[in-house]
Amino acid sequence: MFRRKSYPDWAAVLAAFGLLLGAAAPWFALVLSIPPPAVQADAQVLTDEGGEPPSSQVRSGDGQPKLIALTFDDGPRRSTTTALLDGLAERGVKATFFLIGEQLENNEDVVRRMDEEGHQVGIHTFDHVRLTGLSKVDFDAQVDRTRQLLKNILGHNDFLLRPPYGIMDDGIRRHAGCPIILWSIDPEDWKDQNTARVVEQVVSSARDGAIILMHDIFPESVDAAFQIVDRLHQQGYLFVTVEQLFAARCLPLEAGQTYSDAYP
């Protein structure tokens, strides 16, 4: 059974802010301070307990906070992933990384850094094979093997799964043992590694509750990610992990179920 990592009770956090704002609806506005030039610690309100309520508000048109999840597949690759982590740290942004098992060796410190800096870590199989049609034994060699490697590094096994290519079947749902995360925005950054095109496609498609798919193994994608963050910050978006996105919307993540977005 999927056991969620021990995060704060987001509903209670949001409810507390709602009371401070005098909100009576089930959805309460998320309060966040945004000092220029970039948002500092987007997810701080969602991750830090006991902090003072910040001063300014970022909401969508119906009063809900505009949340979006940035996710990266196929890492870790030391050169590009560490550069990405540096830039995300400068911007106070949390992301979700779906990792390849065979690339974990000699990158354990990179994975620990992800976890320590508040990012979410997930499974992207051992060597990026299609999971459809696999026997339980072969499926476990891809997913459970990677899960165990991550557990050895991080000390827990609360990981989401993203199947390569986003291809699904009933066998994956039966065997996953955890929630399955797809996406709602795919700029196909792997195709031509065109930074400008990727940025424009993501920014023009951005929507409250979206999950963005990118890859942290291309320098062009790393550059694009920074530009996307900076531009969407200007539009009032808050970047959170996948689990934070669903928890803030009071949407449960269940083992064997597939999720592509958390649209209001």
Regions found by a protein language model. Name each.
Residues 111-113, 137-139, 196-197, 254-259:
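Short low-complexity, flexible loop/linker segments enriched in glycine and/or proline
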Residues 80, 129-156, 167-208, 221-224:
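Alpha-helical scaffold elements lining the catalytic groove of polysaccharide deacetylases
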Residues 74-78, 102-105, 121, 127-130, ...:
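Solvent-exposed loop/turn segments at secondary-structure junctions
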Residues 68-71, 95-99, 120-123, 159-162, ...:
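Structural recognition of the beta-strand scaffold that forms the well-ordered cores
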